[in-house]
Amino acid sequence: MLLLMTTHDSMPDLAQITDAHQVTPELRGQLIDCWIAVTNSGGAAGFPFPPVQVNDVAPVTDKLLGRLHPQHRRLITARFDDVLAGWVVLNHDPYRLVGHWGTVNHLQTHPEFRGRGVGSALMRELRKIARDELGLEQLHLAARGEEGLEDFYSRLGWREVGRWPGALRLAPDDTRDEFLMLLNPL
């Protein structure tokens, strides 16, 4: 009997999904579970007021999946042994004025897989897809301040290009900046 073990040093298997019909019920469930786990552990992943449950996250996940399209929105997943470790969304607006850049949304790593390079691997793959498959020249993202995310993205070549001071009020005594980052060239 051959046992397949995932070592701490192994890299995740990456895949991209461009159509909702490519999402199995199992993957849909894992995406929802990941989003819940990330949010409820304090992650800045689109639901700013934890705790969240399946009935909060499932409709948003379904809406996101329903908008997948090869030229406009792609889902990139990272797995270890068929278990979802993380995911990210690449958005591209084909309108001529802004069609040369894309937007990154919802980067998240399941808490059980943090510290294993999942987020970095997802962002490297997203960059490659944006450049090589969509022909994009730059990527944009916005994220919550005071989470250490600025340093994470900077290590991957991103640079801060702006900040909305006090834009995000998480609690009466917890107001954060939203920072804007750019990756250019790809």
Regions found by a protein language model. Give the residues of each.
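Short aromatic/hydrophobic contact patches that present stacked aromatics
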Residues: H106-Q108, Q138-A142, L180-L182
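Conserved active-site alpha-helix within GNAT-family acetyltransferase domains
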Residues: S120, D132, G145-R163
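Terminal substrate-recognition subdomain of acyl/acetyltransferases
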Residues: L2-D13, V23, R159, W164-L186
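Glycine-rich acyl-CoA binding loop
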Residues: G115-M123
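Acetyl-CoA-dependent GNAT
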Residues: T18-H106, H110, M123-E125, I129, ...
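Conserved GNAT acetyl-CoA-binding A-motif
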Residues: M123, A130-A143
